[in-house]
Curated annotation (Swiss-Prot):
One of its GO terms (molecular function) is nicotinate-nucleotide-dimethylbenzimidazole phosphoribosyltransferase activity. It catalyses: 5,6-dimethylbenzimidazole + nicotinate beta-D-ribonucleotide = alpha-ribazole 5'-phosphate + nicotinate + H(+). InterPro entries: Nict_dMeBzImd_PRibTrfase (IPR003200), Nict_dMeBzImd_PRibTrfase_bact (IPR017846), Nict_dMeBzImd_PRibTrfase_N (IPR023195), Nict_dMeBzImd_PRibTrfase_sf (IPR036087). Pathway: Nucleoside biosynthesis; alpha-ribazole biosynthesis; alpha-ribazole from 5,6-dimethylbenzimidazole: step 1/2. Pfam families: DBI_PRT. This is Nicotinate-nucleotide--dimethylbenzimidazole phosphoribosyltransferase. Its EC number is 2.4.2.21.
Length: 338
């Protein structure tokens, strides 16, 4: 049976969020304090190791089974000229993923991640959200379920990413509705549109917000009206990972925006998440502040497709390597520490 077979099932999952293992956190902190280094000298690497311990429920977490899940979908509003590329590029890039030729293929391989690409009805774009809800209830639940289906017990880490021409416009709409602010504060160049393209994006988001102004302010309604299938897929994967206590690495603006309507209502939804990076999309840093996430990397990336999150896995692996591999003071014969 689908994890999100009904709206009630989705709402129940959002209301019943497991928490990290407090005993594992305590044990991991104790181990950090015993390692042959001054306390705090490895900075955020120490925090990452403790974070991973809490969600894996062990003092010495590992990443033996890591997965990158990339969701793809198309959007009806692209008819308004919001992207530098046609919608056909979404399917072309999915083909490139399958052929092993994309950045995420290289980066997932380098990070030791199993790559899964989930194409969601690419030949059936969402409705134009300036005149209708992007998805009906059934479509949104199906996309959420597709996200949940890629998350399996036994995974040690999940990376989420997306591909969908025009979806930075949907992300801007989700953020503006969830956190306020003008569309101009959230809309950026995306795949590289010029000032005229950004103006078109702002206008489209303004029209969408106006059309849906009287809609219920619930996570599901905001997601189905202003999101997209790949965006709902990311949300479903993150929510299922939480149920299974699997830590998640979020990618850029769009992946994080998938959580905006959920986090605006239930801020704790991001407790099991790390922000892999801060992208060059202007709205991303503002969104990360709302989500309460501090990015691991900031390299000026704006590709999407899980690329920044996959790259950040190397930092997480380094955190676990030091946490698990360093000698303790007792093992090294250092009596009084440093």
């Amino acid at each position: 049976m689908s994890r999100f077979a009904s709206l009630a099932a989705f709402e129940a999952a959002l209301e019943r969020l497991p928490v990290a293992d407090a005993d594992a956190i305590t044990a991991a902190r104790a181990r950090q304090a015993s390692l042959t280094k001054p306390a705090g000298s490895l900075g955020r690497l120490e925090d990452i190791a403790v974070f991973m311990a809490g969600w894996q429920g062990t003092a010495q977490p590992v990443i033996e089974q890591g997965r990158a899940a990339i969701f793809a979908g198309n959007h009806g509003f692209v008819v308004h000229g919001v992207s530098a590329f046609p919608a056909s590029v979404t399917a072309a890039m999915v083909g490139n993923f399958a052929a092993g030729g994309a950045a995420i293929n290289a980066l997932a391989g380098a990070a030791g991640l199993d790559l899964r690409v989930i194409a969601l009805d690419l030949d059936r774009p969402t409705a134009d959200f300036t005149i209708a809800a992007a998805m009906d209830e059934t479509e949104c639940l199906a996309a959420l379920a597709a996200g949940a289906a890629v998350v399996e017990p036994g995974l040690h880490l999940l990376v989420v990413g997306e591909m969908g021409i025009g979806n930075s416009t949907a992300a801007a709409a989700l953020c503006a509705r969830s956190y306020g602010g003008s569309p101009a504060q959230w809309a950026g160049p995306g795949t590289g549109v010029d000032a005229g393209g950004i103006a078109r994006k702002v206008a489209v988001v303004e029209r969408a917000l106006a059309f849906h102004a009287d809609a219920p302010d619930t996570p599901f309604e905001i997601l189905r009206r202003l999101g997209g299938r790949e965006i709902a897929g990311v949300a479903g994967a993150v929510l299922e990972a939480r149920r299974l206590r699997i830590p998640v690495v979020l990618d850029g603006f769009i992946s994080c925006a998938a959580l905006a309507p959920l986090a605006a209502a239930v801020p704790a939804i991001t407790d099991h998440c790390l922000a892999g990076h801060c992208s060059a999309e202007p709205g991303h840093i503002r969104l990360l502040e709302h989500l309460g996430l501090d990015p691991l990397l900031s390299l000026g990336m704006r590709l999407g497709e899980g690329s920044g999150a996959a790259l950040a896995v190397s930092v997480i692996r380094a955190a676990l390597a030091t946490h698990n591999g360093m000698a303790t003071f007792a093992q090294a014969g250092v009596a009084d520490g440093l």
